Amino acid sequence: MAKNLNFFSSGKLLISSEYAVIDGACALALPTKLGQSMKVIYKKEPGIHWIAKDVNGSIWFEDHFQINDFHSNSQTNETTSRVQKILLAASKLNPDFLVNHTGFLVETQLGFSKDWGLGSSSTLVNNVSQWANVNPFYIQKKVFGGSGYDIACAQKDNPIIYQLIEQRPKVEDVAFFPPFHEHLFFVYMNIKQNSRASIQNHYRGISDQERNALNALTKRFLRTKKASEFQALMLAHENIISNLIGLPPVQQTKFSDYEGVVKSLGAWGGDFVLACGPKNSKAYFSEKGYAVCIPYFELIRREN
């Protein structure tokens, strides 16, 4: 019998060029320490027994799929349909990856809350793609759409610059170790945001001038060594995206009295924001009702 398999993919945070990354803007993206693991155990029983566990180890999804067409006898729900689509796309790219095997137990384990928007879908796509030995960018585009930056993060453990050039992903490893990291915090907004819906509802597209401005800001984010300079870049970036999507920056609507700067990450209105301010910022956000406030290097790997 074949050896059991183990896979892991990193979560993601998009620091710059949200929305515009889909139209070729350079984006600074950070893989997170937290991700999703997947264990594949070969079994004699026919079919695929799928178990998904949340960050606490509790089963939040379970189903059985036929191995030839991934049909499920249970009542189809959104998660069943998503897993089926991922497996179907993988099998089309590599029809042999399940051949000569009777059955499997597939067990996934999230390292973060599935409500956080850190990439429960992209990490799953990348793990299945590793199992099937296929291109995860193809599966992501086929099943979910989007720019693919989250797939690039899933494969990495270091910061990247991500860009679509003629719809092909370009991924560049970069150094991003802010000397002022003790002043950086990721704050969960208590709302899971749907990136695809947000793009459809708000994003109007981007001009060459706006794209060039975002590209320049992304490069400056990497170079800056002072918190005050970083804050100025955050504000400039917020203003550009605000004009692109017709929504006010989050600091104006929720954190106007914060002694620092707050920037949206990814789709505006939910998931995480980035705060650059006092070292005791956790107390401020907790008082505002945002209990999840994570210091930068508790979520992002330190570079070697």
Predicted regions mapped to residue ranges:
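Segments that form or flank anion-binding pockets
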Residues: A27
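C-terminal nucleotide
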Residues: A2-S10, L14, V21, L30, ...
